[in-house]
């Protein structure tokens, strides 16, 4: 009796119907948030380059908050430290769900986004460093071009009407999730100027109480929100960037249901509650306060782009991300003898890698941490992030639009449900073959 010939592993496979549906729901929410982000950033850039630019700077630098608690922060700092903690809380929920019940639970499926994210971090950082070996503190910004802005990316997909097939959409989201984990690790390890261990130890108390409550499936807002706020204040006072508190709180929330049944757990429940606040308010407001840079016309743009810091950011996002993600994916396929999923080509991988070069929100945050908000070098970083993200958008649009007809056919196949049982036929065939 002849044994069945083993099949070669497939990259960018579509996964289960439940996981694909969850990814589609998340990307729809991120699309709305991304459009708001783009609108907020556009308003900020236009305002900062009008005769009324001083009023924009005055608003960004307006201080509010109790001075006795060291929380008399500017509105820009509140957006970066406070509102982005909400964004990273959602990222923490996503990360834990992916590792416990999602694609990252399976080492074989996790290998691709993890390797691609690491390549997409290492190569842009290397490109930036090569531009800035001259010293004078510029190397502090090495991590700026390592981030991917998923909300911005999927908003661009919506604007250009590209129908990405499920495998590519899932990869893009999972890549962004791993990217967020790497970004918050970098922020915690490399952008902590001073550390106050007493405050850090004190922060463990509300974090532990929060964890105990959610592990017991107690999720009353009047209990959890004050604990989360207390943890945020203490982490902020410790010297660690306060957004780290958001990730730690997200990690504390259980993913699986306490009754052992399938279905959404507390992490997914909180994600549905908080994501609209993150995508619809936190990230756009941060973008509004972070993106406004006075360019100074064409001469100012040329001056900013003559700075190796800006050049390192632009080439890191445009070239580094593409080479890092596509190159590491090719190496993984070569060493594991894997094939791309049917009807996909390496052009698709390159287009997606270009799209990942849109590094907006976290790149701007790291730029502020590296060089200080409002400094001349931070302004050059903003110009670099904007130019690099726009260039990555243009290149990705050209490649992905070229493949849009093929994508549309794939999406039509993935949506066919001949037996009208609510599950597209292609997923049932995949399950039978698996």
Swiss-Prot record:
GO terms for cellular component: plasma membrane. It is found in: Cell membrane. The keyword Transport applies. The chain crosses the membrane at residues 34-54, 73-93, 111-131, 141-161, 171-191, 194-214, 233-253, 278-298, 313-333, 346-366, 380-400. Its main location: membrane. It is a multi-pass membrane protein. One of its GO terms (molecular function) is sodium:proton antiporter activity. Keywords: Antiport, Cell membrane, Ion transport, Membrane, Sodium, Sodium transport, Transmembrane, Transmembrane helix, Transport. GO terms for biological process: regulation of pH. It catalyses: Na(+)(in) + 2 H(+)(out) = Na(+)(out) + 2 H(+)(in). The keyword Chaperone does not apply. Belongs to the NhaA Na(+)/H(+) (TC 2.A.33) antiporter family. NCBIfam families: NhaA. Na(+)/H(+) antiporter that extrudes sodium in exchange for external protons. This is Na(+)/H(+) antiporter NhaA 1. It comes from Nocardioides sp. (strain ATCC BAA-499 / JS614). The gene is nhaA1.
